């Protein structure tokens, strides 16, 4: 009796296994690919797109190196680069549409694209800087005319005008900007390096706030102590009024004094199409 039951069980298991195999074969015949096949296709698509982006990045780097010595002959190369970037953007959209049903793969793809495009943007900024230095025949203008460009900001030096701190602040507001805020020692060095008059005095966006009894920039943030020398920091702690910039140093004066000023606003994004 037990032998009959064992034989029946084995026969049933074999028939179930055979049925499962038959079902899988039917699914394949109907056009449903195996999971491993789908993953291989997704991985291949990701790899292809990343390679294309890397090729564009390398092309951009080569163009930048060549521009240093051949700035006047780069308009055709920049046009070619613009076409490459547009093709990459089209490919990105097409690839993303294919992986909507694969969240993990889609997020990985987006992170890789974001990283590569960020590096392309950095190279585009360098190219724009070279264009501004070496030629006037270009469309790359992240700042208005008469403004200076540094990193992500534009600066306006009111050299031939003098106003009180409140009126200087208003003038900057009329230009959709603020009195300059110094965020780093590098920015401080940039301001000091500008070709300015022999005795330049420029208002900064730093003033004493009597209500909070502290020094504040126009965005209500407090200045970092690392921006000041020991002398500057001691002067600020002992004084009240408005801050001005002279020969690379920060001083304090009464806000009613009339001197020049510096406005600052965010620079426009550098676009590839602006480089031709």
Curated annotation (Swiss-Prot):
Gene3D superfamilies linked to this entry:
Mannose-Binding Protein A, subunit A
> What gene codes for this chain?
CLEC12B
> From which source organism is this entry?
Bos taurus (Bovine)
Where, by residue number, does the polypeptide cross the bilayer? Answer: 44-64
Return the Pfam families for the record: Lectin_C, Ly49
* Complexes and interactors: Homodimer. Interacts (via ITIM motif) with PTPN6. Interacts (via ITIM motif) with PTPN11; this interaction triggers dephosphorylation and activation of PTPN11.
In this chain the C-type lectin domain maps to 150-264
Classification via PANTHER family: C-TYPE LECTIN DOMAIN FAMILY 12 MEMBER B
Question: Which residues are on the Cytoplasmic side of the membrane?
Answer: 1-43
Organism lineage string:
Eukaryota, Metazoa, Chordata, Craniata, Vertebrata
Q: What is known of its domains?
A: Contains 1 copy of a cytoplasmic motif that is referred to as the immunoreceptor tyrosine-based inhibitor motif (ITIM). This motif is involved in modulation of cellular responses. The phosphorylated ITIM motif can bind the SH2 domain of several SH2-containing phosphatases.
Q: Which residues lie on this side of the membrane: Extracellular?
A: 65-276
Protein name, per record: C-type lectin domain family 12 member B
Cystine pairs: 172-263, 242-255
